[in-house]
Amino acid sequence: PQALSAMCPTLLALTSARDLGVILDSELSFDKHISKLSQSCFFRLRRLRAIRASLSSSALHTLVHAFICSRLDFCNSTFYGLKASNVDRLQSIFNAAARLLLNVPKFEHISVAIRDALHWLPVKQRIEFKVCLLVRNCLKGSAPEYLRELCVTIGMNEFRPNTRAAERGDLFEPRVRTERFGRRGFSAAGPHMWNSLPTDITQLATTNGTDT
């Protein structure tokens, strides 16, 4: 770590820091956070497996959602753009949780069962869904102002002329120079993903009065 000294005792820069339960590192790789998360979730899965015979199906589902799914979904919009190896690590936790719920052997294929029996989205799609949900909340005015300011329709942006995209209500996508920090930011990722959705879905999502 680099040291910082300016008329005060030398301060060492940290390579990672915890904020709201998420471990952030200087490269935004989330390697350390995912390692801690994986360790914690697999520990809880082992404990649940040990008492599985004493639990009803509904109780087991409740415990898995409380101790596993909720932890994996917490702040998962920050995982957008993760390298594939880390996405796979998160998916392995979901797979293990699904095997516990469905009593599927370790080496048996689980993806179809996750989709058909549990109706769970894969990790990558769960992350993308959370980003789109945040955009939807911004457009409906229920998100914090600092996020709403990042979701501006093309017709409202004075730097862009009226186009067919403006007629569709597409969001303004800022130019970014870097993949790691620019394209993964909500200001770029949110509008890009929202604009890629079919128009009938975006219109339904923003006109529906029920928050989900």
Q: What kind of region is each of these model predictions?
A:
Residues 1-212:
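Hydrophobic/basic alpha-helical segments
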